[in-house]
Swiss-Prot record:
Keywords: Amino-acid biosynthesis, ATP-binding, Cytoplasm, Kinase, Nucleotide-binding, Threonine biosynthesis, Transferase. It catalyses: L-homoserine + ATP = O-phospho-L-homoserine + ADP + H(+). The keyword ATP-binding applies. Its EC number is 2.7.1.39. ATP binds at P92, L93, A94, R95, G96, L97, G98, S99, S100, A101, T102. This is Homoserine kinase. SUPFAM superfamilies: GHMP Kinase, C-terminal domain, Ribosomal protein S5 domain 2-like.
């Protein structure tokens, strides 16, 4: 078997939760990080990063991308080679768009390819979930599409969620950060039965709305009582941006992942107006934001 000397992995950013699907549903988006690993003759580690906020990327063994790379080699009981790692950043850091998931998936996939692909995609997925701690970002980052994950008797069960072609994800990405740990600290440790039932019903409605593109279902579905009511206060201007998005024709707006990025779903005919309205609302609130209309990535890590 020939030894591969260099691999390049392109991994999509993701949006998780989609309102009522807290910690169990996520979708891959057409925004990417790219990672190139080149095998070295020595045990040296070289990490170089370019793109937005590249100066913040660790260039030593604490780098999450490299840690995932090493984790796979440990799993297959091999010593990781020295590598030069070149990172091209397209997914904003700490904005609720799965930047850490791109690193985990990128490191695992690159290691698997350099090692001759000893692990199946399902095994790589299990490792990714174990590292991240939850499936909603790493699963769509690896396999693409919109995915629902649940634990079964034999491990994780992953379900493809059909996404109607007329549904456009519109992202408003502010110039401030919100860490996942901070966003989790504000959540209660217990919920009422009524709130659990509310989210169960709305997640079911969301799945059907995404499949059919039916506006009435989507407008009702994008509600949540488990995480968003507690996190909204951490995002200045949330109410104004939400009001503007809905007034411009969005089905609704949710927090992308742990935030602070806000995600609106709209049909093709309203997407541009929704994007403009969200941008204006945040600007009037004194916050700079980049607003992008994206699409569902259906390939995952390539």
């Amino acid at each position: 078997m020939s030894v591969v000397s260099s691999v390049t992995v392109k991994v999509p950013g993701t949006t998780a939760n989609l309102g009522p699907g807290f910690d169990c549903i996520g979708a891959a988006l057409t925004i990417y990080n790219q990672f190139q690993f080149t095998r070295l003759e020595t045990s040296e580690l070289i990490i170089q990063a370019t793109g937005a906020e590249a100066e913040r990327v660790p260039t030593d063994e604490s780098n999450l991308l490299y840690q995932a790379f090493v984790k796979l080699y440990q799993y297959i009981d091999q010593t990781p080679p020295g590598v030069k790692v070149e990172i091209e950043l397209g997914v904003p850091l700490a904005r609720g768009l799965g930047s850490s998931a791109t690193a985990i998936v990128g490191g695992l996939v690159a290691a698997n390819r350099l090692a001759g692909e000893p692990l199946s995609q399902a095994q790589v997925m299990e490792l990714a979930i174990a590292i991240e701690g939850h499936p909603d970002n790493v699963v769509p980052a690896l396999v693409g599409g919109c995915r629902l994950a649940a634990t079964g008797a034999m491990g994780w069960e992953i379900c493809d969620v059909p996404w109607h072609g007329d549904i456009v994800p519109v992202l408003a990405i502010p110039d401030f950060e919100l860490s996942t740990s901070e966003a989790r600290r504000v959540l209660p440790t217990e919920y009422s039965r009524a709130d659990a039932i509310f989210n169960t019903a709305h997640l079911g409605l969301l799945l059907r709305g995404l499949q059919t593109g039916k506006g009435e279902w989507l407008r009702a579905a994008l509600q949540d009582k488990l995480h968003q009511p507690y996190r909204q206060a951490l995002i200045p201007g949330y109410d104004a941006v939400n009001t503007a998005a809905v007034a411009a024709g969005a089905y609704g707006m949710v927090i992308s992942g742990a935030g602070p990025t806000l995600l609106a779903l709209a049909d093709v005919s309203h997407a541009a107006a929704v994007a403009a309205a969200m941008s204006t609302a945040w600007r009037e609130a004194g916050i700079k934001a980049v607003v992008r209309s994206l699409a569902l990535d259906t390939h995952g890590a390539t």
